[in-house]
């Protein structure tokens, strides 16, 4: 396994010089060609996907996981759209983001360049193969793809078609997209040790996967941790906004990382806002896990038919990423308490305040330490496309390099570029005597 990992990483590293200087128009042509190959090979892709579905059933994968694994007409069309959209994005490679002149006449600037070789580990959804490969390729990064063992046939045909498109346009560049076509976990461990060959790892999946990668890796890891997101409804909130925002953030799509898991309510809203909000959520099949105060408010005949969905919260509930129609509820006495709660239980992903008080809103924005912080809007907008950034690799909760949606630009890094005209530090050059001796003009 060590030899296999070393071989694939060496191949990916070798194409970086050619890839980094590839004309943006050529990159876009390749992406469009991949989209054409997906259209032309829909039946083949679905045939390979059927093999994965059978394997998934044989290892008793859950129905939800099998649903995520399925690739039909809709999913293939979605991949085609991703490729077409990425082709339209502005290429960040080579962009000079700033330039200035210092006292000695040096012109100093910053230029965006690729990260290098990116190792992406992901689970189930085969569309990630196309999404990750297209973003890495457009940003001139070589990528090593390692999908879940249950999707190996689908992922392989998708990566093979991508490599075919590259081969058709540029000789010797197909290793810009490498696919790990073996199921052994040891390969992942070996690739995570290859400092100098692999530049960064990006795990996309559950918390256990991300922790395992972070603890094993010798290379840099950009983490996309779980989304324990909260909304705080302040006592100066516009309640009409609050009802809809909370509903949207929990109910619209509960299985994603930017849906809320905790609802924090100011105690002044317990009598009026909370019973109505609770009824909206319960009628929408949401299970409520309440603290003492919010639980007591719901102990009347209006809620008798929902008794099975009204429970007392445990400490563990507030840390939990449910990814389901379950919501933990906490009441607080102040903005300070709300922010303390979010700091303790949140995952620094996306959090929101609903208030009409500008001072409170600005304080929340400044003090809540999350990748995305909202005022009077649903947390469900934390997404590359929704932010106007285009397709993304995920939502980074790290504080180094990239934070929030990791779109095309976030797959590059800045380096310094310096233009001079013979400047010397402290004007120290070759001594006159040595110049004369060696006859240097």
Curated annotation (Swiss-Prot):
Q: Which PROSITE patterns match?
A: PROA
Associated pathway:
Amino-acid biosynthesis; L-proline biosynthesis; L-glutamate 5-semialdehyde from L-glutamate: step 2/2
Its catalytic activity?
Answer: L-glutamate 5-semialdehyde + phosphate + NADP(+) = L-glutamyl 5-phosphate + NADPH + H(+)
Going by the record, the broad EC class of this enzyme is: oxidoreductase
Provide this UniProt record's keywords sorted from A to Z: Amino-acid biosynthesis, Cytoplasm, NADP, Oxidoreductase, Proline biosynthesis
Q: Name one Pfam family in it.
A: Aldedh
- Please name the GO terms that the record assigns under molecular function: glutamate-5-semialdehyde dehydrogenase activity; NADP binding
GO BP annotations of the record are: L-proline biosynthetic process
Q: Which PANTHER family match?
A: DELTA-1-PYRROLINE-5-CARBOXYLATE SYNTHASE, GLUTAMATE SEMIALDEHYDE DEHYDROGENASE
The record's family statement is: Belongs to the gamma-glutamyl phosphate reductase family.
From the Swiss-Prot or TrEMBL record, give the protein name: Gamma-glutamyl phosphate reductase
Q: Which gene encodes it?
A: proA
């Amino acid at each position: 396994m060590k030899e296999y990992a070393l071989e694939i990483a060496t191949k990916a590293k070798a194409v970086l010089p050619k890839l980094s200087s590839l004309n943006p128009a050529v990159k876009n042509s390749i992406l469009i060609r991949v989209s054409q190959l997906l259209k032309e090979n829909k039946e083949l892709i679905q045939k390979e996907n059927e093999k994965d579905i059978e394997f998934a059933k044989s290892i008793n994968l859950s129905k939800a996981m099998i649903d995520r694994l399925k690739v039909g007409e809709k999913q293939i069309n979605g991949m085609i759209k991703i490729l077409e959209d990425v082709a339209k994005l502005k290429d960040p490679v080579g962009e000079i983001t700033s330039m200035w002149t210092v006292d000695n006449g040096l012109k100093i600037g910053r230029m965006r360049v690729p990260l290098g070789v990116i190792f992406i580990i992901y689970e189930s959804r085969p569309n990630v193969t196309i999404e990750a490969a297209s973003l890495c390729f457009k940003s001139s990064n070589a990528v090593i793809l390692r999908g879940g063992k249950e999707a190996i046939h689908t992922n392989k045909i998708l990566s093979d078609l991508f490599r075919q498109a590259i081969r058709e346009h540029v000789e010797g560049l197909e290793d810009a997209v490498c696919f790990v076509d073996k199921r052994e976990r040891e390969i992942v461990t070996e690739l995570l040790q290859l400092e100098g060959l692999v530049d960064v790892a990006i795990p996309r999946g559950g918390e256990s996967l991300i922790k395992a990668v972070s603890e094993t890796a010798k290379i840099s890891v950009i983490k996309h941790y779980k989304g324990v997101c909260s909304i705080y409804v302040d006592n100066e909130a516009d309640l009409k906004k609050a009802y809809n925002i909370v509903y949207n953030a929990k109910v619209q799509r509960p299985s994603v990382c930017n849906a809320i898991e905790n609802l924090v309510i100011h105690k002044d809203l317990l009598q009026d806002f909370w019973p109505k909000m609770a009824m909206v959520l319960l009628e929408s099949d949401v299970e409520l896990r309440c603290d003492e105060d919010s639980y007591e408010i719901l102990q009347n005949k209006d809620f008798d038919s929902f008794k099975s969905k009204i429970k007392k919260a445990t400490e563990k509930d507030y840390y939990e990423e449910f990814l389901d129609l379950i919501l933990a509820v906490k009441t607080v006495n102040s903005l300070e308490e709300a922010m303390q709660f979010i700091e303790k239980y949140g995952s620094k992903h996306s959090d929101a305040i609903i208030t009409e008080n500008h001072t409170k809103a600005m304080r929340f924005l400044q003090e809540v330490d999350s990748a995305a912080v909202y005022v009077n809007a649903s947390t469900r907008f934390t997404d590359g496309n929704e932010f106007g950034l285009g397709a993304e690799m995920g939502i980074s909760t790290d504080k180094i390099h990239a934070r929030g949606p990791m779109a095309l630009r976030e797959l590059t890094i800045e380096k310094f570029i310096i233009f001079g005209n013979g400047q010397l530090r402290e004007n120290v050059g070759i001594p006159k005597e040595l110049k004369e001796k060696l006859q240097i003009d």
